Amino acid sequence: MGFSAHEIRELFLSFFEKKGHTRVKSAPLVPENDPTLLFVNAGMVPFKNVFLGLEKRPYKRATSCQKCLRVSGKHNDLEQVGYTSRHHTFFEMLGNFSFGDYFKKEAIEYAWEFVTEVLKLPKERLYVSVYKDDEEAYRIWNEHIGIPSERIWRLGEEDNFWQMGDTGPCGPSSEIYVDRGEEYEGEERYLEIWNLVFMQYNRDENGVLTPLPHPNIDTGMGLERIASVLQGKNSNFEIDIIYPLIEFGEEVSGKKYGEKFETDVALRVIADHLRAITFAISDGVIPSNEGRGYVIRRILRRAMRFGYQLGITEPFLYKGIDLVVDIMKEPYPELELSRDFVKGIVKGEEERFIRTLRSGMEYIQEVIEKALSEGRKTLTGKEVFTAYDTYGFPVDLIQEIAKEKGLEIDLEGFQCELEEQRERARKSFKIETKEVKPVYAHLKELGITSRFVGYEHLEYETEVLGIIVGDEIVSEIKEGEEGEIILRETPFYPEGGGQIGDSGIIETDKGIFKVEDTQRPTEGIIVHIGKLLKGKISVKDIVHARVDKERRWDIMRNHTATHLLHAALRNLLGEHVRQAGSLVADKYLRFDFTHFSPLTEEEIKRIEELVNEKIRENLPVSVMEMAYQEALQTGAIAIFEEKYGERVRVISCGEFSKELCGGTHVSATGDIGYFKIISESSVGAGVRRIVAQTGRWAVNTAFEEHTTLKKVSNALGVKEDEVVQKVEELKEEIKEKEKEIQKLRQEILKLQIREKVKEERHRELTLYYGVFEDVEPEELRNLADILRQRTGKDVVFIASKKEGKINFVIASSKGISKEVRANELIRQVGKVLKGGGGGREDLAQGGGKAPDKFDESVKLLKELLSGVSVG
């Protein structure tokens, strides 16, 4: 078979390690602090700030195998997936990078050595392309490597010039192609396998290119594509890490791959999308109706729709998660940790969407019937988009169903609706991200960095390195000014990992600065945000930095309690529980976790009891620093969407809890004192939230609750342990009284029928119509139900005016509902009342803004009924 995909990955990373590159583990699919991207879609994305000069790494050469997802924006492969042999949503990108170290010659040498000597690709089958004006790259390939000129293609800017954006770093690129033989045509014969980008210019706003002082290298080789070449496969979907998923699709559908194009498309979609949703959800992206979650939901539903086309009508994708995890857990051990969680989320999504899928078919049939009845030849863009967006149907399937009925679809209108939706999605996720301000980038250029010493110290003598006032770097801050101070060392913890920043005082004998918050706007820079209360503080001053100790202790109690809570949830609810977000403040903690149903009172009680039990045991809280992979192998839990370095801190609470964490903690669980859950709620599909307190704040809340309980028991005249029973009794009494009141209202309304409702004969029909004041819609329906049963050929039109608006009901006797369709009548009558409505054939209701038009609407109804014959 040649090399396996796992072997190729390891060969690549090992090769570049031997060339002095640092192996960097894949970043999560969710990019960190990048407002331009929904997902990491290229190997260079985690290094973007390094290329931009905003971040420094302890190495100048790196190599990685990066998880990527291309589903939106410029690199949107979603709708192509399944129809071609190469497009994927999820893929792995092998890359080597140089940050101002080596350049073209070495990059080309390394690439050539790897493909010819390690992968053993025949030199005579390899071609390269260069940018048409890049003479340097041409000469290296031709004269130094020895590739004849006829196998070097000069291509234009569209093919061989890379740029990060309209402005910023850019440069020519060079690509390596393999000739697969004369039996293939076009791109399938000359298959691009590696792209080398020579980042050597900066493009300004006028389009002018200026050479960079330290040019960079960024290369990318798609693992799936090179595996298909080395394994002799015609399609990426036939390689060893994907084809088992094709076989899974065959098994659950009963279809065979390779017999029919439509079947092959569906099986490829299922295989690709299974990988995408497994990795994305494992990285903490929960399916939802906005932002990243919306994209993952669309991918999941697209796979289900294609499964539906194969005749699969029950949830099935969740069964394939195990296969993805088993294939990919060696290079990505985090998949094993989240296996059960991902399966639970996917199964829940499938169960909900199966119902939607069926109702979606009903919706499409409904809009087709409507179009035909109106004499239209086309389904509108909005109708198509609703089927696509709400019910998750692919456009080509909608087109196919419409074509069977002799209809076309408005693709242009659909695209407009789709663009509007994409814009809404872009806005929804941009809000959550923040870019590095130029002032912080400038500080880094000046070589200013801060070191955190707050694990060991809450007070520290140190030097002022920088001061910012109003986004400007200044030499001093004066009394009354608000600003930011950067210290050489700081005991103040900057907000991160869910923990809020410290507050306190920075002072000298000349000035006092009150620190209200501490942040890390970019790697290496810690800013103390606040106000100068007295005097002045200048750059180079030696200051005394003092953290608010009591507040820090409150935060530490809450942070360690968060770890105990996480462990308790996993212990009592199951291993599927994973942290999905947290906030560790001074007065409370907030913990979001993955679970599929609300917690019962008994579960909440048991969780609270278990955490307090571990607090009473006074477990030692230990801190160890180790390599990331080593930490995972010890059983430490890594948190979704958190970015970890090569070395990590492992926080252990005895044997009960072990997590990767950079936050501050107490030295023993007994220091927490007391833990109390304040609330439990939902924050989205498959995600629950617990708010809790510890220490003095928990005691205060418990005292306030007891005081309130005492007041309530006194007001009710019962003992404290009888309060709940008394409240339940009062609720029952109120419910009974409300029933009596409702019954009396119905009787009064029945009496008002004679006064308010008129009766008229229209051929075989009897029409009842009239207007009431302040009658609820449900009461209107009840009255209409009574009136339509009088003769068996009754039509009812009654309404209620309230606060300048009107609610109305149209009903017909059930025996005549096919001839007198209330849902059609109400749409036309509703227009007169400046509103609308809908419902069943025998009963429909609506609302409008023109109560004074009731008589006019009655007149229209009579005209409509004049042409009705019920026999």
Swiss-Prot record:
The record, for Gene3D superfamilies, names: 2.40.30.130, 3.10.310.40, 3.30.54.20, 6.10.250.550, Bira Bifunctional Protein, Domain 2 (3.30.930.10), Threonyl-trna Synthetase, Chain A, domain 2 (3.30.980.10)
Q: Where in the cell is it found?
A: Cytoplasm
GO BP terms: namely: alanyl-tRNA aminoacylation
Q: How is the cofactor bound?
A: Binds 1 zinc ion per subunit.
- Enzyme Commission number, as recorded: 6.1.1.7
Enzyme class, UniProt record, top EC level? ligase
> Which function does this protein serve?
Catalyzes the attachment of alanine to tRNA(Ala) in a two-step reaction: alanine is first activated by ATP to form Ala-AMP and then transferred to the acceptor end of tRNA(Ala). Also edits incorrectly charged Ser-tRNA(Ala) and Gly-tRNA(Ala) via its editing domain.
| Protein name, as recorded | Alanine--tRNA ligase
Q: Which UniProt keywords apply?
A: Aminoacyl-tRNA synthetase, ATP-binding, Cytoplasm, Ligase, Metal-binding, Nucleotide-binding, Protein biosynthesis, RNA-binding, tRNA-binding, Zinc
Q: Name one GO cellular component term.
A: cytosol
